[in-house]
């Protein structure tokens, strides 16, 4: 994954006196931004009118559908968000805009996490309202706490008082809070990203200071990551081998593994939206593979393999993942008929591969593992490989090259750049440590013959053949 976070550090600050002068962008002013904002806003209104999209509001019944807009409007909308952000910063002023982030960023996340964790969403009827006392009783928290949490949420258009200015007003949904009921996957996203990542991200500075101050390179050692400081050996929040072990084992009784189940579901939905099914079906000449045995490593609940098994009835597919993924495999999504050819085998892909197969498949697995770990995973295949066995890697291309970054809206770039912060906090590496599959497979074992190493759109396709 490539470099796309541009440093603003000057050559003088870096101790370089003969560095070439970098090109500078045109000055941005409040007046210029406001004028452009009006122009871009009118363009969006025109697009919505042309495609019969109702004017979005904060009413709970509102459910905007921007999917009807032409594909090019995705970038246009993010460019509009850039303008809105710039106007916000410039209207506040440099100092106040920084102060606002310092005061509000953590509170924004914490409030959303609290509302989600205690399920405020279902307490208030979509077409009704509730009092502070009724809400407090339903979520089993002191009313005093609820009266502090909800007003902050109001400022972010999450719930609202029925009567503005009345301290005793009843509370109702807005479109933002109602979305948490209409689309339950949003709850999973909040669980995974805020409840799961807030702790490690909040101590990233301490981890960098303790383990990497004055050093030139990261070590990729879990014990030196923020996650490791909290959850690894001697960690105050438990002892887990790594982030995935935590996902797999967190919780007790029926709750054990709930985070892993959420992760499986979120990945399934994300891949649906990104067209991952067609990418998998077109990644290989599956019909030409004949009666092949396919091992899908890190295959979660096996849902991705359903269209593959349906379209190519000669394939026998073995889904491998941690034990907590088996309930997803058994949830009825895969028919009994298909299960004659699609099975589940609990397996940790860092341990030696127990199955001899024709094709080993890694779908959207490697993008958040370090290069060192990827090499270990590949090496674990070797004991089972027969000459001619193939390894197919399909992965997300989350890096953005410098040329694309130069023209991409900053609001859109955030989705790519935030991955580096997350992986740095959880795994001790960044997506900037480019994952060149050819190099990684050769580092694992030079008996791999590289057949393909391609990038198309948001997907990377790699194929190697074992010549041992």
UniProtKB/Swiss-Prot annotation:
Induction: Expression is positively regulated by the leucinostatins biosynthesis cluster-specific transcription regulator lcsF. Residues 1-12 have a biased composition (Polar residues). Transmembrane segments: none annotated. PROSITE patterns: SAM_OMT_II. Keywords: Methyltransferase, S-adenosyl-L-methionine, Transferase. S-adenosyl-L-methionine binds at residues 298-299, 321, 348-349, 363. It comes from the Eukaryota. Pathway: Secondary metabolite biosynthesis. InterPro entries: COMT-like, O_MeTrfase_dom, SAM-dependent_MTases_sf. Coiled coil: none annotated. Disulfide bonds: none annotated. It holds the Pfam family Methyltransf_2. GO terms for biological process: methylation; secondary metabolite biosynthetic process. Its EC number is 2.1.1.-. Residues 1-29 are annotated as: Disordered. GO terms for molecular function: O-methyltransferase activity. O-methyltransferase; part of the gene cluster that mediates the biosynthesis of the lipopeptide antibiotics leucinostatins that show extensive biological activities, including antimalarial, antiviral, antibacterial, antifungal, and antitumor activities, as well as phytotoxic. Belongs to the class I-like SAM-binding methyltransferase superfamily. Cation-independent O-methyltransferase family. This is O-methyltransferase lcsG.
């Amino acid at each position: 994954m490539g470099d796309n976070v541009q440093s603003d550090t000057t050559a003088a600050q870096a101790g370089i006196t003969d560095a070439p002068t970098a090109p500078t962008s045109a000055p941005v002013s409040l007046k210029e931004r406001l004028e452009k904002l009006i122009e871009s806003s009118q363009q969006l209104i025109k697009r919505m009118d042309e495609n019969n999209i109702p004017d979005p509001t904060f009413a709970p019944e509102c459910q905007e559908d921007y999917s009807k807009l032409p594909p090019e409007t995705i970038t246009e909308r993010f460019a509009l968000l850039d303008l809105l952000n710039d106007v916000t910063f410039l209207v506040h002023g440099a100092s106040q805009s920084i102060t606002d982030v310092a005061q509000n960023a953590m509170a924004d996340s914490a409030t959303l996490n609290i509302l989600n964790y205690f399920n405020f969403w279902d307490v208030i009827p979509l077409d009704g309202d509730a009092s502070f006392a009724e809400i407090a009783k339903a979520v089993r928290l002191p009313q005093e706490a609820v009266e502090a949490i909800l007003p902050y949420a109001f400022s972010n258009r999450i719930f609202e008082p029925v009567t503005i200015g009345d301290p005793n007003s009843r509370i109702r949904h807005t479109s933002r809070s109602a979305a948490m009921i209409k689309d339950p996957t949003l709850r999973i996203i909040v669980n995974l990203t805020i409840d799961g990542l807030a702790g490690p991200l909040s101590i990233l500075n301490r981890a960098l200071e303790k383990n990497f101050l004055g050093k030139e390179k990261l070590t990729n050692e879990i014990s030196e990551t923020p996650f490791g400081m909290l959850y690894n050996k001697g960690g105050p929040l438990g002892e887990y081998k790594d982030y995935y072990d935590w996902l797999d084992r967190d919780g007790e009784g029926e709750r054990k593994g709930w985070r892993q189940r959420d992760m499986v579901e979120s990945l399934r939905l994300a891949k649906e939206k990104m067209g991952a099914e067609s990418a998998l079906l077109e990644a290989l000449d599956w019909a030409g593979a004949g009666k092949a045995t396919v091992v899908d490593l890190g295959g979660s609940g096996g849902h991705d393999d359903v269209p593959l098994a349906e379209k190519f009835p000669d394939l026998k597919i073995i889904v491998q993942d941690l034990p907590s993924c088996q309930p997803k495999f058994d949830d009825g999504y895969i028919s009994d008929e298909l299960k004659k050819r699609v099975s589940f085998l609990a397996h940790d892909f860092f341990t030696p591969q127990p199955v001899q197969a024709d094709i080993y498949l890694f779908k959207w697995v490697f993008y958040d593992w370090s290069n060192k770990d990827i090499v270990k995973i590949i090496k674990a295949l070797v004991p089972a490989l027969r000459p001619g066995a193939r390894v197919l890697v399909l992965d997300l291309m989350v890096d953005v090259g410098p040329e694309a970054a130069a023209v991409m809206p900053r609001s859109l770039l955030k989705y790519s750049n935030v991955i580096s912060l997350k992986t740095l906090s959880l795994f001790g590496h960044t997506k900037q440590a480019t994952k060149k599959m050819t190099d990684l497979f050769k580092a694992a074992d030079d008996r791999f013959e590289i057949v393909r190493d391609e990038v198309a759109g948001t997907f990377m396709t790699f194929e190697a053949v074992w010549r041992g």
